[in-house]
């Protein structure tokens, strides 16, 4: 009888041991999955942060490039192309939150470009290079936090209303 009891105890112990090992493996796998999931979330968050920084840097570089190109076109008297470059620069300055250069470009648009162009020339920019002043105004309205851009938006709209409709009207006006 003591052998039977000993055998039974060993068998029970072995079963308990196997069951405990299985439970430990299950728990370890669960903890591994939780750690992997948590690490994936953190890595994904960091990747998104870096992607956003890269996108901001790209937007900043593009904005400055188009800003300079607009200045060159303005100096050469190609105001229609300068306006297109300034519109593109303004969109990129909005993306990278460079409000100082955005104000500069918007002032160039209102002071140097729109007064010298007809609405026909301004609308032709959509076809020429995809620069749409109306989309820029919409985007400025969306990003107009605390009313910082209200006066320049108003000024652009007023200048557009005063602009001659066609190239012929512009020539007659001068």
Report the location of each language-model feature:
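Intrinsically disordered, low-complexity segments used for protein-protein interactions
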Residues: 1-2, 173
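Transmembrane signal-anchor/signal-peptide helices with a preference for the extracytoplasmic
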Residues: 2-27, 31
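Short, flexible coil/linker elements and helix-boundary hinge sites characteristic
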Residues: 14, 97, 113, 144-145, ...
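Amphipathic alpha-helical "stem/stalk" segments
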Residues: 22-139
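Terminal, low-structured helical/coil segments at or just beyond the last alpha-helical repeat
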Residues: 128-174
């Amino acid at each position: 009888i003591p052998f039977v009891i000993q055998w039974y105890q060993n068998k029970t112990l072995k079963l308990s041991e196997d069951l405990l090992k299985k439970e430990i493996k299950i728990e370890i796998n669960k903890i591994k999955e939780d750690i992997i999931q948590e690490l994936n979330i953190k890595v994904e968050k960091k990747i998104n942060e870096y992607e956003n920084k890269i996108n901001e840097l790209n937007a900043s570089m593009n904005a400055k490039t188009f800003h300079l190109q607009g200045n060159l076109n303005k100096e050469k008297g190609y105001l229609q192309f300068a306006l297109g470059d300034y519109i593109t620069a303004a969109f990129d300055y909005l993306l990278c939150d460079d409000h100082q250069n955005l104000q500069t470009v918007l002032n160039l648009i209102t002071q140097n470009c729109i007064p010298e162009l007809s609405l026909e020339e301004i609308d032709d920019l959509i076809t020429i290079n995809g620069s749409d002043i109306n989309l820029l105004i919409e985007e400025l309205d969306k990003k107009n936090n605390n009313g910082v851009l209200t006066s320049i938006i108003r000024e652009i709209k007023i200048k557009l209303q005063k602009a001659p409709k066609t190239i012929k009207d512009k020539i007659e006006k001068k």
